[in-house]
Amino acid sequence: MSSKGQMLQDPFLNILRKEHVPVSIYLVNGIKLQGQVESFDQYVVLLKNTVTQMVYKHAISTVVPARPVNIPHEHPAQKQEQAQDA
């Protein structure tokens, strides 16, 4: 997975995890899963409902939070400027 993909996925999933936001996860085969993001890594998301399911990211089509979330993100140029200022 590209680092740009991780720059988007990780903050998004982390906010969902930290704030215990209920989510609907749609798989590429059309199945809808619901629960809360318990944990995640490069390849999987642990989704907790009555049980914890390990869902492979390559099988996920869409992640839909039950409420709006603010995702803090920086552009690479901003990161470089901050590093140079330090």
Curated annotation (Swiss-Prot):
Pfam families: Hfq. The keyword Ligase does not apply. Residues 10-69 form the Sm domain. GO terms for biological process: regulation of DNA-templated transcription; regulation of RNA stability; regulation of translation, ncRNA-mediated. It comes from the Bacteria. InterPro entries: Hfq (IPR005001), LSM_dom_sf (IPR010920), Sm (IPR047575). GO terms for molecular function: RNA binding. GO terms for cellular component: cytosol. Keywords: RNA-binding, Stress response. Residues 67-86 are annotated as: Disordered. PANTHER family: RNA-BINDING PROTEIN HFQ. Belongs to the Hfq family. RNA chaperone that binds small regulatory RNA (sRNAs) and mRNAs to facilitate mRNA translational regulation in response to envelope stress, environmental stress and changes in metabolite concentrations. Also binds with high specificity to tRNAs. Homohexamer. This is RNA-binding protein Hfq. It comes from Chromobacterium violaceum (strain ATCC 12472 / DSM 30191 / JCM 1249 / CCUG 213 / NBRC 12614 / NCIMB 9131 / NCTC 9757 / MK).
